[in-house]
Amino acid sequence: MNFTCKIYHSGGFFTTARSLYSTLCHDVYARDMAVIPHFTRSSSADDIASALTSFGCVIIDELVDHQQVEALLSEMQPFIDATPLGQDDFTGRTTQRTGALLARSAASIDMVAHPLVLEVTQKILGLSATTFQLHLTQIISISPGAPAQPLHRDQWCFDFFEFPAEMDVEISTIWALDDFCELNGATRVLPNSLMEPSSAVTQTDRTVAAEMTKGSVVMYTGRTIHGGGANQSTAVRRGLNVDYILGWLRQEENQYLSCPPEIARTLPENVQRLAGYAIGAYALGYVDDVRDPNAVLNGRDGGSSFGGLEINTPNLA
């Protein structure tokens, strides 16, 4: 893959650019520039969340090691090979979308539940909900010759409901399982598009390729206009798409069938809860006699409580 993405390996250019982007993300004038702020694995969640809510997108460079990526691909390759191509232009007629990663790959947990990603997500989604949950897990394999995906907003999956303009209901991530560059179909994003009208999806000339090295991750919000890039290289471009949503919204990937109880109970408890085996709000997701789903999953009684939260009744006087 290196021959398609030489920008990352020539003359220290990427290191210099990454430093520049990291500086720009703290510069008020960068708001008007078509760049994606870059961060490192040692950056603070506060700084990343601030840039994400300002620009709508950030890249955290080399957040996991190549060995972690290779472990994931080794476990998932048989499932990728068996995945059919998409049946429409949006899904991608030369693109494979392979899901159910929690059930199929132990190595996926390194990325699906990465502490820094979850901390950033909590800082943003925590403003609008008691909890957040996993929305989907999917390896996207874009074959050579694939055209660019139509631009869109991820939160349109909620029946195109018009949420309040400044409200974030979803945080999306795409992990680079190969080096991402414009030539091989790096995800294209429209920086500063959070408040843009929906008609901006036609402005493909304003998009920027999320170029990054293997093991890096691009994060963007449900309001950010973006789309998969055209793969003009000779190799498949692979990325891991993991999205998170508010605890009171429906998940795109049905985790309870994709990762059923007999598999879910083998996962770490924080991952079980992230997948949705938990109370989503004080009265959402309980089991039978108002029992906590995580307790039931793990063979505990679970009591009888609407989440154990104190409910503050609005003052309607």
Per-range role (PLM):
Residues 97, 104, 135, 169-171, ...:
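Residues that flank catalytic or metal-binding motifs in active/ligand-binding sites
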Residues 1-54, 314-317:
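Fe(II)/2-oxoglutarate
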Residues 115-119, 171, 213:
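A structural signal for well-ordered alpha-helical segments within the folded catalytic domains
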Residues 196-219, 223-224, 229-317:
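Conserved double-stranded beta-helix
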